[in-house]
């Protein structure tokens, strides 16, 4: 609506950032176009001189040390000749340009007309000079074009800066020119020219062989030691200042020292030497005072140097034989062998729960009572007999009651009728001792206690068999 009425609108921050991004993209695209144009122009000019440029690069990077040394000596001789000669500069410049023009005419105009062409010249026209580590003409022209475009952009920015800020440009240019004037006043121009020549000659060599990286790797330990030495020097200076302040103000230093000692004493409690020696003298088989007090309070204690996970470490160390250690730990595993009294019950759902200890004394006769009433009457005695001595009644009562009820229910469900012998076998099967769970195949001489009625039933069968 505002645009339709002709009211100018100010762009927001989002639109401003978008505009700057578009301007940066357009500027980079224009720069790439300029670089490509300059590269094409340089390739057209330097294309015929590719072998010569390759030889110059090989000489600058010292691929062939003999030729490179000759080139270096020739350049040094030419430089010092022009520097120390009594001839005029204009004469030398004109004479040098005349020699260059003659060589160019001979190589490009006269020699191609009088030389005999080779038979494979047409085949070699499509091939170019390739070196694995030297720059080809297109690559060299690309780098030169980037430098040229960067220089032109810099000059353009300087001219724009001069137009927008003439005062700042005047101060900046005067400062730079003053520095160059002082440098030229104290350093001869001949030496500066020679340094520039040596830099141009040695720079490709340093880049080609990565001398800067190698020098940094060699100097890195020394620089690190220098850094540490500087830090140590600063720390020593700080300590000297502190000592000087303490010497000038001893009362303040004593107050600070006492305060620091009190603070450290608060964090470091004092220990009695006799108590420490007595605690250190306690062996693994003895008990300390703290352990005895814990025992008096009714809680369990652990000997020094033992934990619930490492309480049996001495026993494990004593049994190095794997078979012996396996046989020793075998009673801890539940047995898979069923009691002979419980073989007739196929649905044994005890699921490996610890069975209750119940053994009738030898010679005692069991009263002929119904199985259910006899089991119910024996339940309290079983629970009290199976209760471990010295254990906590409250913690074990729930588990014992639940186990007894499950066993009674299973024994009641497994008996089919009023017959007493199968019910007694089932009850004894479910109320067997833990020692019966440890029977193996080798221990096949198991026995069970039978009533007098059972013995009378078995006697006629044995007499008939005999």
Curated annotation (Swiss-Prot):
GO BP of this protein: collagen catabolic process; endoplasmic reticulum tubular network organization; positive regulation of neuron projection development; reticulophagy
Annotated TM spans: 81-101, 164-184, 187-207, 382-402
PTM-bearing positions, type N-acetylalanine: 2
Feature: compositional bias, Acidic residues: 438-451
Keywords, alphabetical: Acetylation, Autophagy, Endoplasmic reticulum, Membrane, Phosphoprotein, Transmembrane, Transmembrane helix
Mode of membrane association: Multi-pass membrane protein
Cytoplasmic side: 2-80, 185-186, 403-466
Modified residues (Phosphothreonine): 10, 283, 307, 310, 440
Motif (LIR motif): 445-450
Chief location of this protein within or outside the cell: endoplasmic reticulum
Biased composition (Polar residues): 294-310, 453-466
Region called Disordered, residue ranges: 1-28, 284-374, 412-466
Induction (record text): Induced by amino acid starvation but not by endoplasmic reticulum stress.
PANTHER family assigned to the protein according to its UniProt record, in alphabetical order: RETICULON-LIKE PROTEIN, RETICULOPHAGY REGULATOR 3
Record text on subunit structure and interactions: Interacts with ATG8 family modifier proteins MAP1LC3A, MAP1LC3B, MAP1LC3C, GABARAP, GABARAPL1 and GABARAPL2. Interacts with CANX. Interacts with RTN4 isoform B.
Annotated protein name in UniProt: Reticulophagy regulator 3
Gene name tied to this protein: RETREG3
């Amino acid at each position: 609506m505002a645009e339709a009425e002709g009211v100018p609108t100010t762009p927001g921050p989002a639109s401003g950032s978008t505009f700057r991004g578009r301007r940066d993209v357009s500027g980079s695209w224009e720069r790439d176009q300029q670089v490509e144009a300059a590269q094409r122009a340089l390739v057209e000019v330097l294309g015929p001189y590719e072998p010569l440029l390759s030889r110059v690069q090989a000489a600058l990077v010292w691929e062939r040390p003999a030729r490179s040394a000759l080139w270096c000596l020739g350049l040094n001789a030419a430089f010092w000749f022009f520097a120390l000669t009594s001839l005029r500069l204009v004469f030398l410049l004109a004479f040098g340009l005349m020699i260059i023009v003659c060589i160019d005419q001979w190589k490009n105009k006269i020699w191609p007309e009088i030389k005999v062409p080779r038979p494979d010249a047409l085949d070699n026209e499509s091939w170019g000079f390739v070196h694995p580590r030297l720059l080809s003409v297109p690559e060299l022209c690309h780098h030169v074009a980037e430098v040229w475009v960067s220089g032109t952009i810099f000059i353009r920015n300087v001219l724009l800066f001069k137009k927008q800020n003439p005062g700042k440009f005047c101060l900046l240019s005067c400062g730079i020119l003053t520095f160059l004037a002082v440098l030229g006043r104290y350093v001869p121009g001949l030496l500066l020219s020679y340094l520039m020549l040596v830099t141009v000659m040695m720079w490709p060599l340093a880049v080609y062989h990565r001398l800067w990286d190698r020098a940094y790797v060699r100097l890195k330990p020394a620089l690190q030691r220098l850094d540490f030495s500087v830090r140590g020097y600063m720390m020593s200076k700080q300590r000297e200042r502190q000592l000087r302040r303490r010497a000038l103000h001893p009362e303040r230093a004593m107050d600070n020292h006492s305060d620091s000692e009190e603070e450290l004493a608060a964090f470091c409690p004092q220990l009695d030497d006799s108590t420490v020696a007595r605690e250190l003298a306690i062996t693994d088989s003895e008990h300390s005072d703290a352990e005895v007090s814990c025992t008096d309070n009714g809680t369990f204690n652990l000997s020094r140097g033992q934990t619930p996970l490492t309480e049996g470490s001495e026993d494990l160390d004593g049994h190095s034989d794997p078979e012996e250690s396996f046989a020793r730990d075998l009673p801890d595993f539940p047995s898979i062998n069923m009691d002979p009294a419980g073989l007739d019950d196929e649905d044994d759902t005890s699921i490996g729960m610890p069975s209750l200890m119940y053994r009738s004394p030898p010679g005692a006769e069991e009263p002929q009572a119904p199985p259910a009433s006899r089991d119910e009457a024996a339940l309290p005695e079983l629970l009290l007999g199976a209760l471990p001595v010295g254990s906590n009644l409250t913690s074990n009562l729930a588990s014992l009651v639940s186990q007894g009820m499950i066993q009674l229910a299973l024994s009641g469900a497994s008996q089919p009728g009023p017959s007493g012998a199968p019910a007694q076998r089932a009850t004894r099967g479910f109320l067997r001792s833990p020692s019966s769970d440890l029977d193996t195949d080798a221990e096949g001489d198991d026995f069970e206690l039978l009533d007098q009625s059972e013995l009378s039933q078995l006697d006629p069968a044995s007499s008939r068999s005999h």
